[in-house]
Amino acid sequence: MTAGTTTGTTVGDRAAIALLALSGRALPLLREWVGGDPGCGVARGLLTLATGDRMADSVLKEQLALAHRDARTAGEREASLVYGVFLHTHRQYRLTADHLVTHFERWPADELAGLMIGAFSACEDAAYRALGDTLVERQAALAGPDNWPWTGWLASARAEQGRVREAHDLAERALARYPRSGVAVHALAHAEHELGTGPASTAFLDRWLTADPGAVQVRHLSWHAALQSIACGDFEDARRRADAALPRQDVGMRAATNWRLLLVGQEPAGRSDPEHVRELLTAPGGTAEVFHTFNLALALAVEAATDDLEQLARRAAADPRPDYRDVLAPVVRTLAALTTGRPRAAADELEALGEKAERIGGVRVEREIVQDTLARALVDAGEHVRAADLLHHRTSTRRHHAYEDRLLTARTPAAAAGPG
């Protein structure tokens, strides 16, 4: 496919465009591509990239071996691309990032390689995130402003850097070029969260998702719409959206929604099964990534499972990994303190943590819940002025901030005993 194209004459072109757009048509088209051209290593590699997390290890290994063999026959770029897929599907994110740097030196602005750009942030390392941002900036400049995939990725980078207006403009530019760009609409959702756009954002997301209900990000974008409803104080709509879009086993986004609701004294949406949460924590991948573990902790906090939280905090404090020991442990202790009505202790934990809280993982919109938690703890501890200062940048710049106003509202002693 040519750079920034919006249509394709071959099934391969259409599949690549759908995958770049995170369309619900991507998987059927990729399967059609592989079925019609089983010797195309890139086709098989991209299908494996899209579905590898659901494959058994033996199947994953077999598909990647076939893809790389055929890609080597096609050429060096194809072989390099599939090798990147091999690294990415094996969660070797640092190696993936290092490989992408070399790949882009040889094949600048390669859109299909851009599908793996998330490896830089997945490294959970500030230096790699910065390297990824620099790489995206360079590739977007080389690709030009009419290239919707790279403009969308640049919009995402700008949103995460807090350059919200620029992110918004870039996302709109990408969507003007290709209205079905899932990357661009996701970047727009992040920007509009920080702008407090409210009903205008939810209406746009509803229209966009109606056109492709099978879109890859349907649940995540529905979650963004629920957050906009929370921002406006329409808590019933937030619950409705969460229950309609998020299955009970989707612990992370459901917990992040429910904890926000509880922080402002509202009933949560449907909850996750606590036993399922405990099973996830004890599973081999339960503490593999700090942000995943944090989301499980939020789910426990929603249930006021103080004993589980304290046990998890001790486990994190004994972990040799700095982000677990120095960041996750105090955050989990904060949640435990709030569930037992000890806001002063909770506030002390988070204030001592300071900017290190950024290392909890996730993106800005997701990490904001840590600040929400500190604001609630400060208000419940009688520190309203400090809480207001903490949220001033939000209440003074967001069009809709009913949620922040609720966070800054003192609760009755009974309600202040803790979320849950």
Each predicted region: which residue ranges?
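Generic helix N-cap/helix-start motif at coil->alpha-helix transitions
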Residues: 6-11, 38-42, 74-80, 107-114, ...
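Residue at a conserved register position within TPR or TPR-like alpha-solenoid repeats
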Residues: 18, 51, 87, 120-122, ...
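Residue-level detector of the short coil/turn that links helix A to helix B
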Residues: 55, 91, 125-127, 162, ...
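Helix-coil-helix junctions within alpha-helical repeat/solenoid scaffolds
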Residues: 227-420
